[in-house]
Amino acid sequence: MKHFSRYWLVVAVVFGLAGCNNMRTPSDIPLAVPLQPRFEEEVLLIRLEQILSTASLSDKERAELLFERGKLYDSLGLRVLARNDFSQAILLLPNIPEVFSYLGKYLVLEGSLDTAYEAFDSVLELEPTNIDARFERGVALYYGGRYSLAQNDLLEFYRQDPQNPFGVLWLYLIELKMDADVAETALAERYNAAVGHKDWGWMIVDFY
């Protein structure tokens, strides 16, 4: 049943890609500007294209190469090309948690929150201990106004990584929507419980 639900998520993502050029980008989400590829990245892209076009590959091998090329596109800010490769990869091999994680982030940026939740759910089905996916799903739930569920995810993230300033900050922002007084008290307690405050992220927490 879980594999079946992931299949329909893949279908939704692929068909969403076909219409993404017609989507309006929300004004509060900055547009990514593609970076100029370095020589090494250009060579790697050419090599990956040659392998994908000419080599006899198993589905697993092709999916892994598409994933690697998608990550390279993503690092260059080429989201449409990256998402296309990720979508092809999970059609071939729908059990790569990292691909669902990337797609979930894209879907949040596009405002497709329900599908983003499903993408992060798929990551956690494949890797139940993946706390990064729990963090990302919590942030997506925050943007969707589902604050109680978002709090559950960020509390679990905090329990496993209490020294992470961004987990503390997002937990505060979520709880601020629920009860401002409780959020302020909890933020102070978590800040004081952290050791050292050496990570630069704590400087952001200081502003709150």
Question: PLM features: residue spans?
Answer:
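N-terminal leader/linker segments that initiate helical-solenoid repeat arrays
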Residues: 20-68, 76
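Register position in tetratricopeptide repeats
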Residues: 75, 109-110, 143-144, 177
